[in-house]
Each structure stands twice: as C-alpha cells, then as structure tokens.
C-alpha cells in the first residue's frame, strides 16, 4: 500500500493561526491541530510552527485560507496572506494552494457553539476548526483560487 501524503491547512490571522492536518489513512477528512498565538504580524513564528509540523507529519500540500470580501474582491487581509504565501514559497518546497475562506471562521464558531462549550473555549479553538473546514473543502473539491 502506497504511503498517503497528508495535507496541512492554515487559517492565518494577524495574531493567531489555526492548523489542521488530513487524516493519515485516506486523506478524506481534516483533524484540527491547534490555534497558535503569536505577536501581531510576527509571521516568522508561524513559519517556525509549520517547520515543526513538517518534521512531525509528512505533507505534500499546504492549504492557505485566502480571505476575500463577500463580493469576491481582495482586501487588506488578502494582501497580508499573499505576502505570507511568498514567505511560504521561499521556505517550503511543498505545493501551496490558496482556498477561499469566506465565512469559514463564522461557520467554525457556529459549529463550536453547538457543542455547548464556553466562549473562551470557542475563541481558543475557532481558528483550528476554520482550518479544518478549509482543508475539508479542499479534500472534497480539489479546488483553489489559484
């Protein structure tokens, strides 16, 4: 049986990043990993965390949430993610795919709220859940915005 190369997803913010990884057997579903908090705009910390995950898990694709406005146009956050994407490409050899993340955090919060956990736990888990939603979308559709 051939080894499955996993996928990892990131939901990047200015002070936190959610990570999710695909399952090791079939790449058919996403597993939330963690919400990683860092100093505002210190994206080198995110790169270092991704290097940690690269050692821990073998993955061949990095899925990066791409925040577009509801109209489909780019925003200030879109430009931030594009700059981070350039940093990823300089650092990693894996395929990098941008995936439209509109409403992913809203959906993640709603899903977590349904589990009756506290607001502080929702805040703690929302980004990794959003990353899992992005990754599930990619795994189910194999579509990216570029």
Curated annotation (Swiss-Prot):
Pfam families: RuvX. GO terms for molecular function: nuclease activity. It is an enzyme of class 3 (hydrolase). Its EC number is 3.1.-.-. GO terms for biological process: rRNA 5'-end processing. The keyword Hydrolase applies. The keyword Cytoplasm applies. It is found in: Cytoplasm. It comes from the Bacteria. GO terms for cellular component: cytosol. Could be a nuclease involved in processing of the 5'-end of pre-16S rRNA. HAMAP family: Nuclease_YqgF. Belongs to the YqgF nuclease family. This is Putative pre-16S rRNA nuclease. It comes from Mycoplasmopsis pulmonis (strain UAB CTIP).
């Amino acid at each position: 049986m051939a080894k499955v190369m996993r996928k990892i997803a990131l939901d990047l913010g200015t002070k936190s990043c959610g990570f999710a990884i695909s399952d090791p057997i079939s790449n058919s579903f996403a597993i939330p990993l963690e919400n990683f908090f860092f100093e505002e705009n210190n994206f080198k910390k995110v790169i270092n965390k991704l290097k940690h995950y690269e050692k821990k898990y073998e993955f061949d694709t990095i899925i990066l949430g791409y925040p577009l406005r509801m109209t489909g146009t780019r925003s200030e956050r879109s430009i931030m993610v594009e700059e981070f994407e350039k940093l990823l490409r300089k650092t990693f050899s894996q395929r990098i795919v941008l995936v439209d993340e509109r409403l992913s955090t809203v959906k993640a919060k709603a899903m977590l709220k349904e589990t009756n956990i506290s607001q502080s736990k929702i805040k703690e888990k929302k980004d990794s859940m959003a990353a899992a939603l992005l990754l599930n979308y990619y795994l189910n559709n194999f579509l990216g915005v570029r």
